[in-house]
Amino acid sequence: MVGRAVHKALVAEGHEVRILTRNPKKQGEFAWNPAKGSIDPAALLGVDGIIHLAGASVSERWTASHKKAIMASRVQGAETLYRAVAAMDVRPEVVISASAVGIYPNSYDRVYTERDGGAAGFLGDVVRAWEAQADRFEALGLRVAKLRIGIVLGQGGGVLATLLPLFRLGLGSALGSGRHWMPWIHVDDLAQMCVRLAADRNLSGVWNGVGPESATNLEFSRTLATVLQKPFWMPAPPAFALRWVLGEMAQIALMSTHCSAEKWRAIGFSYRYSDLRSALANLV
C-alpha cells in the first residue's frame, strides 16, 4: 500500500522508479532476496536515491517465528542494500528508511518529537535496530533520513482493511478505554513526505511520519462511523480481552503515541488531508 503510493508520487514528479522484489515480472522490477543477501547488481546503477520500505507486517499474530521475521526482514534488507552500495564506485546520494513510532514509550499525555525515543519491549528493539542499520549509510557518504511512520490510512491494506468490515455492518467500537492516541496519516501525504525527503538535500535525520493532528481511539472510531453513516453503539472490548485474543500483538491496538508534526510545518510541508474526517472520507 505505501510502496504503491510512493511509486505513484515519484512517477508523477517525473522520476524513473526501480522496484526491488523477490519475483520481478515487469519492466523496472529487479530481483533481490534480503534473507540470502542477494540483489541484482543492475538495480542500483545510476540511481540518485533509495527508499527502503520493506519489512514483514507487524499486524500478524506475534508467534516466535513471526517476531524473528519482523526483525530479520528489516535488518537483512538494510544490510543487503548497504553492501550493494558499499561496492559501488558511484553511489546514490540519499537513503530514506522507513521506521516507526513504536520507538516512543506508551503515554497518554506526552507529545513526542523526533528527539524522543526509548520504548522498551519488542517494538522498541525492532525500531532501534532498524534505524541503526540506516545510520550506517552515513559512513558511505549518503544523506540519511528516517521516517517514523504512524498509523497509515489507505485503501487495500493497513488498519482500515481490518476495521471497515465491522464498521460497515454498524458493529464498530472503540478499543479498550479508547483514550489511547492514534498518530494517523493518509497514505498520499506519507508518499509526499518520501518525495520531499528524497528531493531536498537539506533534509536528513529523523522525521515523524504522522498527520498534523492525532486522534484518540474513541475519536477515530466515532469519526469513522460518522463518515460511513453507521451507528456507533457497540461496547468497547476491554483491554484484557484484546490481550487474550491477540496476545503480545495487542500492544499495537492499545499503544498510545501522540506525535508532533511540527518539524514538517517548519519546512512548509502542505498536507493534503489535514483532518481525520477528510482523510477517511477520501478512503471509504
Language-model features and meaning:
Residues 197-248, 281-284:
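Mid/C-terminal beta-alpha module of Rossmann-like enzyme folds, strongest
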Residues 79-121:
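Conserved Rossmann-fold NAD(P)-dependent oxidoreductase catalytic core, especially the SDR/UDP-sugar
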Residues 26, 31-77:
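NAD(P)H-binding glycine-rich loop region in Rossmannoid oxidoreductase-like domains
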Residues 164-172, 180-215:
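Alpha-helical substrate-binding/gating segment
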